[in-house]
Amino acid sequence: MINGLAPNFASGVEMVEYDEVCSAYTNLLDLYHKHPDWNVLRVFFNQCIAYWKDRPIISPHGSVPMATCMPINTKLFIDSDLQIGVCEKISDKYRIGDIKTGINWEKANSIVYEYYNKRVERCRHCPSVRMCDMCLTAIEYTDEQWDILCHNEQVYTRVFMYLFCEMAERGMII
């Protein structure tokens, strides 16, 4: 079984600092600017700025958005035991049915409610809530783990916005 927190905490995760991350990404961006034909960097930076480039326009008031894999989305998969899973990257405990009986809607909804309630509690006033990639397995995190990941999500949100602006100024956005 894959750990529900893998790979996030398998080796330990520390808080990152904005200046260090921004500097590292800027160095990579400078390299990509010199070598625009390097496909790996092109794909990497397109992923970094994808939200900013194609961001959905939603009301900032009201419910807390859930920008993550949810049961009954396009990431559903079937494992070797014919169980229906939410995402191939997370724990076996997130199986929501099987091929013979279909989706267990009570279990799927229970997972979503638990995740949503935790996000409402933790994320209601977060400036990065609409850009957050916090995984569904976040319902298993301790408060300390949430604090670390939330801090890091906010740092990367700022870095990716910086990259979007920097790439736009350099004429690198297609």
Where are these regions (language model features)?
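Flexible mid-to-C-terminal extensions adjoining Fe-S/redox cofactors in radical SAM and related proteins
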Residues: 83, 89-174
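Radical SAM enzyme [4Fe-4S]-AdoMet core and its adjacent flexible, acidic
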Residues: 1-85, 90-95
